[in-house]
Amino acid sequence: MIQFTFRQIDYFVATAEHGNVSAAARARHVAQPAMSMAIGQLETLLGEKLFHRRAGHGLTLTPAGRILLDQARALLSLATQMSSAAIPPAGPLKGRLTLGCFKDLAPYILPRLLAGFRKLHPDAIVDLFEGDFTAVRESLVGGRSELAVTYELGIEADIKRWVLAELPPYALLPATHPLARRRSVSLAALAKEKLILEDMAQSREYFMSLFWAHGHQPRVSQYTQTFEMQRGLVAHGAGVALSCTRPAGDRSYDGVAIACRPITEKLAPQRVVLAQLDAARQSPLAAAFVAFAREK
C-alpha cells in the first residue's frame, strides 16, 4: 500500500489551484522548500510526475496530475467531513472564506446575508469576488472561491448547489410607456419593442430563448455591461428589458421611475443558488455559511 500523508495531498491540491509552489506555500503558511519536498515525495510514492515544470511558466498538471486532483479533493473533503462530524465546532467560528457572487445579484442578496452571518461569527472574514457568470464559475472551479451565489443557469450540472430563492422573469418598461398601463405584459407585445439586454452570453441566451420558445423574434437595440445601465436606459425611454433580479426600488440611479410588470405567459422562475464543487473540501466556516444561508 502506498503510504502518502494528508499533508502531501493538501500541498498537491494547493499547488494545482495556485499554479506555482510559491503562491501555494504562502496560502498554506509554510516554507516553499517544504512544499516542494512534499510534492516531490508524493510523485516518488506514486511513480508519476504530477506537474509539468517550465521555467517562467509556472506549473501545469500532467494527465496523471489531473486525475489525481479530483481524487485528492474528494479525499480531503471526506477527511474534513469526518473531522467535523467527530468534533463539531462550538460557538462562533474564526477564519477566512472567499465567496463568489454574480455581479447583478451581489447587491441584491449579499449585504443581508453577510450582516446576519457576521452576528453569528463576528471574527470570521468573508472575502468577496464579484463577476459575470463565467468569472464566478471559474473562481469556483479554479479554487479561488469556496462558495458562490449565482443564478442556476450560470453553473453546470456537476456542481453542487442549494436553492436560496426563485425569481420569475419580469418586464422593465419606461414609466410613461403605454404597456406600463397594463397589469401584465405579454412576450408578443415586448417583441415589438426595442429590447435592451445585458451583454453576457448566458443572460442573452436565456432571455432570447423565452421569446423563441413562444415563436417571437425580438429586436435587440442595445447591449449594456451592467444591470443598472440597462435599467437607466429603460427609464429614459431607450427600450424595454427583461430581468429576474428585482431591486426594492423601481427607479434608476438618477431617480427616474421604471415600471416593472409580470409577464403574461407562465414562465419558469430562475433559481438563485449557493454553489460548491462536489469534490471540493468544505471548511467549517463554509459549512456554517451554507447552513445559515439555507435558513434565510
Regions flagged by a language model, labelled:
Residues V13-A31:
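Short helix-boundary/capping micro-motifs
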Residues E43-P63:
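A short LG(V/I)-centered, amphipathic sequence patch enriched
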Residues H57, P63, I87-A106, L120-A124, ...:
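Interdomain hinge and pocket-entrance segments immediately C-terminal to HTH DNA-binding domains
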Residues F12, A24-A25, T62-G65, F117:
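Hydrophobic two-helix hairpin corresponding to the core of helix-turn-helix DNA-binding domains
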Residues A157-P168, R182, A189, E228-D278:
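Beta-alpha-beta core module
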Residues L45-L46, L68-A90, E152:
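Alpha-helical linker/hinge and terminal dimerization helices associated
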Residues E193-H214, T245, G249, Q282-A291:
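Secondary-structure junction motif
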Residues K94-E156, Q217, T224:
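Central regulatory/effector-binding core of bacterial HTH transcription factors
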